[in-house]
């Protein structure tokens, strides 16, 4: 007799799976068989053959669906977590003098511990059981080992830099920062703890230069600060050129203003001189006119007095004296008249000279000729 489990049935036949992996087909004498039921068959009814991979595809769709769902669940709960725990989500470097880099998985566990120099290799060799250990515990072990070997002392700087594979995963980043802050708070009273973040491009550049990410960032910061100091201490060539151009423009403007001011002062001086000369000439003319008016008034008064008064009889000697006095008065009158004409000629000449200064093109004034033509002729001419 053979035993088997019913895996399929229809109205005529049932299919059995034997313990040795054979499929047997037998007649369905009883319609009350159930799938999964174990039954006994006579040996002569054996129709078996060994099960093959292709028999799986001959199962009914319902059974096929159940099997597929079971496989998916196994992959999600068994295979996928194993794969995820072996993937690096972040890289963290610790710089004391030994430099070590840790790779963290999704559970914040260390999956890789890489020394970055000879001292770092010694530290890695001294640490046991670091794989799949929380990164805070590994940091504690690294600091303790460095302290025992004299690599780190009190007040020395410990630099921790973190690089994330997926910079958009804010949940993971916040969790790492929180745990790293706990480590910093723990050691800040003993050492100078500093933490910073960077990106994958910076990490690759640091690897090419053979240094840690933190050391690479610090080195670039020093170079940038040095360049900034050099730039601030030395003015650029463009600024020098602009300042020189501004100074030249200011100098040209000052020279132009000075020249204009000098021309204006010369014109003002010439005008003031002309005005003074004209005033002096006018004063001389006024004085001459006053003298003439006074003399004419005296002569008029004398003539009137002669009409009303009888001329006294004088002896010849007195008459001769009077004639001499009259001749003297007439000569004095001629001298006064000549002096007035000379003063007018001098004032006219000065005005002509002033006019020449105001007219640099050389056009002469006709005032002198006009005045000479209008001036009265001397008595007796």
Curated annotation (Swiss-Prot):
Q: Where is the composition biased (Basic and acidic residues)?
A: 200-210, 219-244, 273-321, 349-359
User: Looking at the record's lineage, which domain of life comes first?
Assistant: Bacteria
Phenotype of gene-disrupted mutants: Cells lacking this gene exhibit normal cell morphology and growth rate at 37 degrees Celsius, however cell diameter is slightly decreased.
Signal sequence range? none
InterPro entries noted in UniProt: Anti-sigma_RsgI_N, RsgI_M
- Show which residues sit on the Extracellular side of the membrane: 85-381
Looking at the record, the residues that make up the RsgI N-terminal anti-sigma domain are 2-50
Q: Where is this region: Disordered?
A: 198-381
Q: What is this protein called?
A: Anti-sigma-I factor RsgI
């Amino acid at each position: 007799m053979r035993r088997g489990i019913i895996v399929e049935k229809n109205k005529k036949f049932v299919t059995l799976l034997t313990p040795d992996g054979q499929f047997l087909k037998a007649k369905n004498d009883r319609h009350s068989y159930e799938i999964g039921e174990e039954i006994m068959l006579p040996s002569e009814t054996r129709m078996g053959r060994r099960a093959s991979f292709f028999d799986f595809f001959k199962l009914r769709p319902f059974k096929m669906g159940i099997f597929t769902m079971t496989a998916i669940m196994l992959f999600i709960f068994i295979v996928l977590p194993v794969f995820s725990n072996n993937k690096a989500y972040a890289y963290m470097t610790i710089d004391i003098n030994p430099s070590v880099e840790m790779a963290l998985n999704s559970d914040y566990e260390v999956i890789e511990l890489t020394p970055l120099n000879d001292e770092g290799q010694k530290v890695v060799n001294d640490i046991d059981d670091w794989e799949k250990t929380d990164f805070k515990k590994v940091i504690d072990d690294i600091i303790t080992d460095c302290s025992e070997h004299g690599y780190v002392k009190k007040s020395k700087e410990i630099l921790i830099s973190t690089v994330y594979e997926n910079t958009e995963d804010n949940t993971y980043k916040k969790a790492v920062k929180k745990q790293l802050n706990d480590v910093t708070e723990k050691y800040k009273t003993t050492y100078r703890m500093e933490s910073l973040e960077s990106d994958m491009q910076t990490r690759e550049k640091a690897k090419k230069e053979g240094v840690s990410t933190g050391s690479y960032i610090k080195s670039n910061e020093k170079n940038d600060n040095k360049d900034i100091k050099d730039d601030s201490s030395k003015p650029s060539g463009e600024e020098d050129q602009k300042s020189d151009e501004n100074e030249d423009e200011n100098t040209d403007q000052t020279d132009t203003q000075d020249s204009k001011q000098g021309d204006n002062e010369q014109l003002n001086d010439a005008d003031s001189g002309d005005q003074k000369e004209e005033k002096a000439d006018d004063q001389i003319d006024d004085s001459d006119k006053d003298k003439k008016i006074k003399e004419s008034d005296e002569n008029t008064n004398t003539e009137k007095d002669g009409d009303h008064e009888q001329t006294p009889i004088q002896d010849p000697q007195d008459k001769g004296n009077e004639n001499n006095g009259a001749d003297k008065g007439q000569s004095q009158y001629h001298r006064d008249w000549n002096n007035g004409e000379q003063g007018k000629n001098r004032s006219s000449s000065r005005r002509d000279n002033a006019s020449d200064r105001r007219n640099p093109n050389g056009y002469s004034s006709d005032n002198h000729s006009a005045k000479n033509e209008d001036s009265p002729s001397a008595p007796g001419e």
